[in-house]
């Protein structure tokens, strides 16, 4: 959970990290898109799902 706490200081895009499966397919992965949206809109400990 410490990874998401860095979201306040670091960039919003690094706040949410995609699932392990999404790392292989970055472009076609839907989970990564949802994670980035979560960071941009609500980037305060709201990204625990991803």
Curated annotation (Swiss-Prot):
Molecular functions (GO terms): DNA binding
GO cellular component, one term: nucleus
Keywords: Chromosome, Developmental protein, Differentiation, DNA condensation, DNA-binding, Nucleosome core, Nucleus, Spermatogenesis
Family per record: Belongs to the protamine P1 family.
Record-linked Pfam families: Protamine_P1 (PF00260)
GO biological process assignments: chromosome condensation; sperm DNA condensation
Cysteine pairings via disulfide bonds: none
Tissue spec. comment: Testis.
Top-level taxon in the UniProt lineage: Eukaryota
Subcellular location per the Swiss-Prot or TrEMBL entry: Nucleus; Chromosome
Function: Protamines substitute for histones in the chromatin of sperm during the haploid phase of spermatogenesis. They compact sperm DNA into a highly condensed, stable and inactive complex.
Organism: Trachypithecus vetulus
InterPro entries xrefs: Protamine_P1 (IPR000221)
Segments crossing the lipid bilayer: none
Name of the protein in its database record: Sperm protamine P1
């Amino acid at each position: 959970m410490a990874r998401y706490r860095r979201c306040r200081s670091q960039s919003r895009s690094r706040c949410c990290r995609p699932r392990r499966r999404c790392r292989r397919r970055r472009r076609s992965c839907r989970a990564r898109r949802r994670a980035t949206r979560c960071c941009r809109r609500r980037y305060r400990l709201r990204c625990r799902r991803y």
